[in-house]
Amino acid sequence: MASQGCVDWQFSGSDAAEKAAQASLGTYSSEIFSLCDPQGKPILPPLSEEAETSHTAEKAVVKAVLCGTGNAYAPSIGLPVAKRAVAEYLNRDLDNKLTGDDVYMTVGCKQAIELAVSILAKPKANILLPRPGFPWDMVHSIYKHLEVRRYEFIPERDFEIDFNSVREMVDENTFAIFIINPHNPNGNYYTEAHLKQLATLARELGIMVVSDEVYRWSVFGSNPFVPMGKFSSIVPVITLGSISKGWIVPGWRTGWLALHDLNGVFRSTKVLKAAKEFLEITSKPPTVIQAAIPTILEKTPQDFFEKRGIFLKDKVDFGYSKLKNIPTLTCYMKPESCTFLWTKLDPLHFVDIEDDHDFCRKLAKEENLVVLPGIAFGQNNWLRHSIDMETPRLEDAFERLKSFCERHSVIVEASSLKDVNGVN
């Protein structure tokens, strides 16, 4: 048997992995859920409960399994039929049409983010990310040793991008601005005029736009969704998407990256070549789901998305009305997309709450209610509330939230805080 004496091992865990994990939404989510009591009142939102997907999507996957069309390895850049189907689907909203060659299939939108960051990263480079924003962009930027610069929003103007903050932080090493549209966690989505302003500014600054559009099927506002790819005649655009949110199938792990490049900039700057090379050395999305993609995208009835939108709008209206009775939290706008409410927390309104992280930890311990802290999205003292529950559970969740805030608050009367949106 080998000696068990002291050995100077020449390996250790990655510091980059530890730093990236600290920025991960999953790290915060796991921590908060772990503080709940499984023997107490029902944990809200329920763990691992998902709404029902489209029967068309289910049947498409079953057919792919039974026919064997998804049994083999797919090309590293994706099945040609899946790539063409995505291009044709996106082309419904585009003047400058895509082909299958412009689309790369990925393992969900997360790998699409990783791909976008990896193929563009260079020494000393920096990228503009939203504050707040979904943290996967931050995680992968940390791994690639990119400098992250956070641009701001204007809450009082329905969370429009603060273009002044963008202009101020760009230098010769900035290569892209990353947007989330529709936005998680703000719950807004951008008008055509605002996106055109962004494209014009990006062109002026010499940077590309990367747009995460995974929530495009979860829009329930009065205005139509406008994809960033519509402005590829002004600036090179990369759009990211997947079926996870629109079809409520995050476990199917299938997404894409699309290059909108009317003027051939991606080819001349070797972005196309880098994308193909990156995908040669990474995992591929399930072939069986790729084989089903054409039917999923083409045949899913529109009323599936309409019913989902009605459900989400109803829950947003309900949750927003309940927040009016919790004066310690401020909701600047009623969301028009996604599945969350985003509220500002002022610790000065509480007796014993230090910040958003402390709020969420204590809420989980006392009420078995999971709300995620804004720090998980890069913004201190904000909270993200899930509304993707049936009404009885949602009512229970907001009653628990209200009780918790009343116990810890220095504010007694609900009327003592101004409602920034008025009665709605």
Swiss-Prot record:
<dbReference type="GO" id="GO:0009058">
    <property type="term" value="P:biosynthetic process"/>
</dbReference>
<keyword id="KW-0808">Transferase</keyword>
<keyword id="KW-0032">Aminotransferase</keyword>
<dbReference type="GO" id="GO:0008483">
    <property type="term" value="F:transaminase activity"/>
</dbReference>
<dbReference type="InterPro" id="IPR004839">
    <property type="entry name" value="Aminotransferase_I/II_large"/>
</dbReference>
<dbReference type="Pfam" id="PF00155">
    <property type="entry name" value="Aminotran_1_2"/>
</dbReference>
<dbReference type="GO" id="GO:0030170">
    <property type="term" value="F:pyridoxal phosphate binding"/>
</dbReference>
<dbReference type="GO" id="GO:0006520">
    <property type="term" value="P:amino acid metabolic process"/>
</dbReference>
<protein>
    <recommendedName>
        <fullName>Probable aminotransferase TAT4</fullName>
        <ecNumber>2.6.1.-</ecNumber>
    </recommendedName>
</protein>
<comment type="similarity">
    <text>Belongs to the class-I pyridoxal-phosphate-dependent aminotransferase family.</text>
</comment>
<dbReference type="InterPro" id="IPR005958">
    <property type="entry name" value="TyrNic_aminoTrfase"/>
</dbReference>
<dbReference type="InterPro" id="IPR015421">
    <property type="entry name" value="PyrdxlP-dep_Trfase_major"/>
</dbReference>
<dbReference type="InterPro" id="IPR015422">
    <property type="entry name" value="PyrdxlP-dep_Trfase_small"/>
</dbReference>
<dbReference type="InterPro" id="IPR015424">
    <property type="entry name" value="PyrdxlP-dep_Trfase"/>
</dbReference>
<keyword id="KW-0663">Pyridoxal phosphate</keyword>
